[in-house]
Amino acid sequence: GVESVAIDPNNDQKVYLACGTYTIMTGSILKSNDGGRSFIEVKVPIAMGGNENGRGNGERMMVDPLNSRNIYFGTRLNGLWRSVDEGMTWKRVDSFPDVTEQTDFSNPQNRMNRGSGIIAVVFDKKEKKGNDAKNIFVAVSLKDRQSIFVSRDAGKSWKAIDNQPVGLRPTHMVMAADRKLYISYADSPGPSDMTDGALWSYD
């Protein structure tokens, strides 16, 4: 299964796929330099769940629009990862907060509605720090605690944004041309057992 797809906004011939069907095994990043006609496989020590709950969340992997060498990938179980060489090598971003979800998964209902890890990465392309995007937003599938984080220094440090809702899980996050974030929420990562949701914006 494919967990996430990213296209270089500066070169649409460069395509990245995060591949792995279930989190019981590690996956791979596939990279194409020719618009998807051929791919290079880069094995990574990251558990992916392209056929698990939350498979419609996203987008987990994004290319920095101000520096195409930088790619961020939000994982289900292994935190936030970054490549600085166009996807050829990957390293965990240790400065990102611990977003482990403490839930009793012995309850079948809890297992069905558990979060799906880091579900979205969004770059603000309007501000630069050095060669990189200065402001990076990350959404995590957390229900009862803060779930949207921002870095104002190109990924060196992170904090939760102010005045965010709790009680629902983020499912998608995008930034409009006016730099406003739009975040959709639901009571489950989906596609199963989703009965409630909301849409919030953040200036």
Locations of the language-model features?
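Extracellular glycan-interacting surfaces
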Residues: G1-D203
